[in-house]
Amino acid sequence: MATVSAPVKRARRLRPAPLWLSLLLAFLAYFLLDFSLRLFYGSMSNVSLWAWQPLVFTLLWSGTMTAIAALLPRTGRRIFLLVTFVPFVLLAITNCVLYQLTGTCFSFADLAYAGDGARFISASYFRLSKGEWFSLAVCMAMMLCAVIFMPKARPGRRGRIVAAVLAVACAAGIVVVHNALAYRGDAQDRSEYLSWDNAESHDTFRDTYTDFSNPNRCLMLTGLYQYTVRGAAVTLWPQDTATDQRIAELDDYYASHPKAAADTPMTGAFAGKNLIFIMMESMDDWLVTPEYMPNLWRIEQEGLYFPNYYAPMFLSAGTFNSEFTANTGLIAPEHHVRNSYYAEHALPYSLANLFRDAGYSARSYHAANPNIYNRGQIHLNFGYESYNDYGDLGMDDYMLDSQLLRGYDQIVSDEPFFSFIITYSGHGPYTTEQQNISEPHLDRARAVIDYSTVPYTTEAQKEEYTRAVAQAMETDAFIGGLRERLEADGHAEDTVLVLFTDHYCKYFSDTELIEAIKGTSDHNLLSNVPFVIWTEGITPQVSEKYVSTMDIAPTIVDLFSLDTDLRYYIGNDMFGPDGGVVYFRNYAWYDGKTYDTGNDASTNPAVLAMREQVREQIDISQDTFRSDYFAYLQKRSGETEAK
């Protein structure tokens, strides 16, 4: 007689749970996944954890998915629950990690720029709190129990009818709540709804949901499931903003907002000179010291230095965000835009096009493959004649900025040239994963760092800080080598260097360390980074004006006396009287005295006026690009000339 092993006996005793219990566990897993995410990250916006909108959306989505599962046979039910639940667990983790790194949660727009960042994913970034991991584990355990102990039985006829009715009712409820929150009306109604003389109109939940351009607030307002579905819809299937009405509105705005060039002592100061335009990867202000980066520090001492320069991140892809704005003078839209727009929409006022119109060659240089961010095509659309990667530059290791100098003879020419360079070595993570960058400089880094001034609390933080400094030294080696070559061949006097950082040093695995280093935990204010202009023989200046990436293009236009229409740049000449205010994502702003996020009901007329200006100018700039407005201007101009 065959004997039955103890494990088999125990397995047989694991009876399937009643269907209602397994479905209840699934429902609770769906609901608690969202609730715990909003519980731990509620500080990312002013939406209450108990606001009815996210609670209702999440209850309805949880009900819809659970009711659909009830209608399926056991195998289909198990597959459906796992297929709908596991991706949302991964999205919840992604939102947590991105918020810790960038201050902004995930949006589908990030997928368009994921190529570069994906190669730098590090386990060190997944530093969720114990409470967060515990809540995720509880939710996953509940769903696994629901799946494992799912009975074979299906609901009876009456049960299936009830499940179908619940599924339809919950889905219909989602549509009803969506329609209740989304503003519907013509453009005039919309304009009045958002008018600033209506005290209740500013940044209401309805406004936030309709625009769906503030990821943090939208996630807290709608919950994980509705945020994901609506976010995918507005990003992957953007509405056509190039309507005749919107074009007419842009016409009216630009016609009523002329912008004349400011006549300053710096106007035309570099006319006829060459420009090497360098965007430095993650070179934060605290890295620029005579010990860490002596070459960049020297340039700051001898050049035109702006200590209050900020690099706001309107896209989570911080590098491309600054790359786009610095080159075009426009703010990159996050939603309602396809990645293809960047390679297709007309950009006649980009720096590359303006320099080429002035008789310069214009080429871009970056070690990364041209397929990353689709840079190869996008840079051509910016107006560059070519995009040159590590192979074109003769580099052996694309991560080493010092090897960019192998392409010096391509970057520098005896004919007028404009060269745009993006460095690489400062990119995180600051671990042994990138030791090919840090190892050559580690001994020197350890020798020059005064660890008594570094606010580290663990040995891991100390090592990460050291490797960040070592990687910055590699970028500094390129900067120093470039200056030496320019001086050696006589180009230092006829060539201008403009160096700016794409974003702050955001790749520390422990955000508390970078916050302690920079003295703030606000992700907007963390974006204070280096910006300097240098050429041989220039009189050093330090400007305390508050400026940002959006001011770069109009400043270069004025310095080099380029012919353009300044109305189409959202920023201002850094040396002129206008501007002095930094605009951030979600319409926050900072002028050195007032930092306003728009979350309070201010009655200060000056603050309200600035809020209106910031919101209007950001929307206009983003819609100018979204709607391909410059293509309409070119078409209109062509039709006029034909007549």
Language model regions located:
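A residue-identity detector for tryptophan
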Residues: 20, 50-52, 61, 133, ...
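Extended, compositionally biased non-globular segments that define protein topology
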Residues: 1-123, 129-133, 147-151, 642-643
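N-terminal start-of-domain structural block
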Residues: 36-58, 149-193, 369-401
